[in-house]
Amino acid sequence: MDKFKEIRPIVLGIAKNNNRLLVSEGYDKVKDSTFYRCLGGGIEFQEKSYEALKREFLEEIGKEISVKDFLGVSENIFTFEGKKAHELIFFYSAELKEEDYQEEYVMDEDGKVNKAVWIDINEFKSNKSIVYPTEVLKYI
């Protein structure tokens, strides 16, 4: 089934360090808009959300995390590159091991190379930079 025509369960990790949030950069060509999103991804059938978060961090940046507190669930109905989407998002606080902190991480997702970076939380709170879903702002 087309992932844009179903409700997709995902999990996102709120990883903070020195008032900075670990995010990956995204770009919507239709809106000509750059945005940021916390790391995480889809929850597979019969997979616990916190297990999916650990798997996603390992897949995305090659680092193990400690999943800390469950922060909440949010429903996200949005349009990305002209396509309507619907997500049910589980939020957790997450921590990397001290020795695994880097200024940026190279991400390779299915051949698409991107990077994860630490952005000052005030950039998002002051609306200088956009973080999606906006519910992230409640947890930072």
Task: Label the predicted regions.
Residues R8, K16, S33, C38, ...:
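Short connector loops at helix/strand junctions that flank enzyme active sites
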Residues L21, E87-I89, A116:
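Structural motif
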Residues E64-V73:
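A short coil-to-beta-strand element that immediately follows conserved catalytic motifs
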Residues F78-E103:
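Active-site-adjacent beta-strand/loop module that shapes the phosphate/pyrophosphate-binding cleft
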Residues E104-Y139:
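NUDIX/MutT-family hydrolases
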